[in-house]
Each structure stands twice: as structure tokens, then as C-alpha cells.
């Protein structure tokens, strides 16, 4: 198994790690309740997807 001949510098290591960050999730607006949701998924607030109710959502209002 080959081993490195020389130690990688901090700059070289940092430059490689510069692209390891995570990107933020893209959000779209629910056309039914205008709540932010992930695209291609049912809305967690109203339960609608593509104009149809696919989830039964309970109201937590007291």
C-alpha cells in the first residue's frame, strides 16, 4: 500500500477543503397555504401536493 512521501501543507489541505461546504436547501412556496416547503414534497402545514390533499394534518390550536 503506497504511503505519502511528504506531508501536505496547511494551504493545500485548506484549498482542498474549501469546496466541502454544504449548500442550503432550496425552498418553494405552497400554492395552497403559501408556506415554505421543499419542492416535490407534500406541504407539512396543509397536507396538499399538486392541488390534492394527500396528508391529513391535525390543527394544534388550543
Curated annotation (Swiss-Prot):
Pfam families: Ribosomal_L32p. Residues 1-23 are annotated as: Disordered. The keyword Endoplasmic reticulum does not apply. Keywords: Ribonucleoprotein, Ribosomal protein. GO terms for biological process: translation. The keyword Acyltransferase does not apply. This is Large ribosomal subunit protein bL32. It comes from Koribacter versatilis (strain Ellin345). The lineage of its organism: Bacteria, Pseudomonadati, Acidobacteriota, Terriglobia, Terriglobales.
Amino acid at each position: 500500500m503506497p504511503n505519502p512521501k511528504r506531508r501536505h501543507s496547511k494551504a493545500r489541505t485548506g484549498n482542498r477543503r474549501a469546496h466541502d461546504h454544504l449548500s442550503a436547501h432550496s425552498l418553494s412556496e405552497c400554492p395552497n397555504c403559501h408556506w415554505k416547503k421543499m419542492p416535490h414534497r407534500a406541504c407539512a402545514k396543509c397536507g396538499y401536493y399538486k392541488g390534492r390533499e394527500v396528508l391529513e394534518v391535525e390543527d394544534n390550536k388550543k
